[in-house]
Amino acid sequence: MAWLGVAVGVLLLVTAAVTAAGWRGDAGSSTASTPSDSVLSHVHGLGVNPADGQLYVATHHGVFRLSGAQATRVGNGRQDTMGFTVTGPDEFLASGHPAPGEDGPRHLGLIRSTDAGRTWQSLSLAGQADFHLLRFSRGVVYGLDSTSGALMASSDRVSWQTRSTVEAYDLAIDPHRPDTLLATTEQGMRRSTDGGRTWEPAGGPPAVLLHWSPRELVAVTADGTLVRSVDGAATWSSTAGRAPGAPVALTVHENVVYLATEEGRVLRSADAGATWQPMMP
């Protein structure tokens, strides 16, 4: 119960920040409202590509690759890339909105890249769904549609089932059991063991971001504290460190934690959140 009394006001602030971070981009030339090809703005998602070991950042203005201390826009796409997940070597799934001036539907539905974000193809739900969260495990894709609040699932990336309605900051899937999900919500963490059809309180910390790897479950609270669980969220441990800034995106790869903040900073921690280092100057 001690967890539940922490950071409620900060959670509301994070909700407002996430809601304010909408979709923009430009497939053509840069405009005054579009950042340069090396500037991150409104980060929505993070993922490490197994093909090159590099961190990819989904933003308000396309997808960037972080290599060393440099961010480089991948391809010419400047779509507002909201939902984002890496599903395999050079394969990404995403959603969102086209850049201003681009042809096509207002909502991208599910799109896929098989060349590490250089080009994208529409797979399903174009014009119908705007997934602000996408998660993948063992062949199942889960998407949280911002237009309806529906949690949807697909095993072929074409046909979808609506499982429930849930207001979540983030979702994580058990890497061994794709029907087991955790969601971070304003009411606390919630768990589903039937593929998102029903939910129950899961206890635990007042987290906003989640990442579930085969090794452990990692969560970040609204004040930037990193907590970990090695028993499927039954118990949690935390470190003394705290990430600077309001957290908006999280991923973990080979024991390195990557975190993006509302200010557009991307940080890394190799000591479970005890200390954080910026990835760009």
What spans do the regions from the language model cover?
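C-terminal region of N-terminal signal peptides and the immediate post-cleavage residues
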Residues: 15-38
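Beta-strand-rich domains and repeat architectures in extracellular enzymes and scaffolds
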Residues: 35-64, 76-85
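Conserved beta-strand position repeated across blades of beta-propeller domains
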Residues: 44-47, 85, 135, 172-174, ...
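Short coil/turn segments that connect the beta-strands within blades of beta-propeller domains
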Residues: 51-53, 89-90, 138-139, 178-179, ...
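Residue position within the beta-strands of beta-propeller blades
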Residues: 57, 94-95, 143, 183, ...
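Asp-box/BNR beta-propeller loop motif
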Residues: 62-74, 107-124, 152-163, 190-201, ...
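Short coil/turn segments at the loop-to-beta-strand junctions that recur within blades
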Residues: 77-82, 126-131, 165-171, 204-209, ...
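Short, solvent-exposed loop/turn segments at conserved positions within beta-propeller repeat blades
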Residues: 101-107, 144-147, 183-184, 221-222
